[in-house]
Amino acid sequence: MFAPIIAIDAMGGDFGPHCVVPASIAFLAENPSSQLILVGQPALLEELLSRHPSLDRQRLRVHAASEVIGSDERPSQALRGKPDASMRVALELVRDGCAQACVSAGNTGALMALSRHLLKTLPGIDRPAMVTAVPTEKGHCHLLDLGANVDCSAEHLYQFAVMGAVAAEALGCASPRVALLNVGVEEIKGNQQVKLAASLLQKAEGLNFAGYIEGDGLYRGEADVVVCDGFVGNILLKASEGLAAMVSARIEQRFRDGLAAKLVGALALPLLRRLRGDIAPARYNGASFLGLQGIVVKSHGSAAEEGFQSALRRAALEVRENLPQRLHGRLEHLLL
């Protein structure tokens, strides 16, 4: 059986190894063919791992790295300094063929800069894009870019659309519907970059371009891949996560107001828990860096154990599907 090997920046994120270690152990329990490499400070990692004496250490190894890239450090600092940072070392393991994917909850800008520097982009790709799954009425859609590219040309949006479509196909969506996020669905709507990107996508053979989509259409499941620049995508993603948390909290509060509400709440609790699970950010945690010659998945910095597990699952799936190679094989036929 194929055994994905994933290198983990164990020191990144708000909780560092205190989240990464238990999430890694839980991931290995549900994925018996996978192997993990925890990159970070050995003394701390070994102390946390020692609390799990039954753990199969053949499948979970520690790789030493003495430095950590802080959340407030600039990408340029990450590139020039800290050669022994856990994030950098984890990416070097992918570059050198010791691992097939890297997962980090650390500094997003630093992770993107180091990924581009160490792994390089696929031929024909100017900029990698961040993509993740977003829940919809019909399941989920793939949204990109999520913040890696704040300012985008029409050509960049076109490349994102092509990469998103190929990735969606590789992850099980046949002939994915691709749409550009816009302020309206009419052809006259949108800024110049979006209009030019639409013109390019209309001419692309082998791409199922569905035109423009508005924010509400995204959640109705009117497209399988939704493309926008990183400025819009990041705001949309954060607003969606905040809205989901607010709705969940409001519903819980209403069911605690009075005896009758509590009785109704008790009956509705299983359904509400299922609904919360369907839209929980932790379930969809893990944004992939598309367009690189290797697999990199960014976990939310504030993700807890369940969320980090989701990021590991996404990385393992992309390894099994050989995503960079599949992208490379299709991109040369679709890129301008």
Curated annotation (Swiss-Prot):
Q: Which GO terms describe its cellular component?
A: cytoplasm
Q: Name one GO molecular function term.
A: phosphate:acyl-[acyl carrier protein] acyltransferase activity
> Quaternary arrangement and interactors, per the entry?
Homodimer. Probably interacts with PlsY.
The subcellular localization recorded is:
Cytoplasm
Lipid metabolism among the record's keywords? Answer: yes
Name of one Pfam family that matches: FA_synthesis
Which BP terms in the Gene Ontology apply to this protein? fatty acid biosynthetic process; phospholipid biosynthetic process
Q: Where is the signal peptide?
A: none
Name under which the protein is recorded: Phosphate acyltransferase
Q: Which reaction does it catalyse?
A: a fatty acyl-[ACP] + phosphate = an acyl phosphate + holo-[ACP]
Report the sequence similarity comment from the record.
Answer: Belongs to the PlsX family.
Keywords (A to Z) from UniProt: Cytoplasm, Lipid biosynthesis, Lipid metabolism, Phospholipid biosynthesis, Phospholipid metabolism, Transferase
Coarse class of the protein's main subcellular location: cytoplasm
Task of the protein = Catalyzes the reversible formation of acyl-phosphate (acyl-PO(4)) from acyl-[acyl-carrier-protein] (acyl-ACP). This enzyme utilizes acyl-ACP as fatty acyl donor, but not acyl-CoA.
Give the metabolic or biological pathway: Lipid metabolism; phospholipid metabolism
What is the species of this protein? Pseudomonas paraeruginosa (strain DSM 24068 / PA7)
Instruction: Report the enzyme's class at the first EC level.
Output: transferase
Q: Which NCBIfam families match?
A: plsX
This enzyme's EC code(s): 2.3.1.274
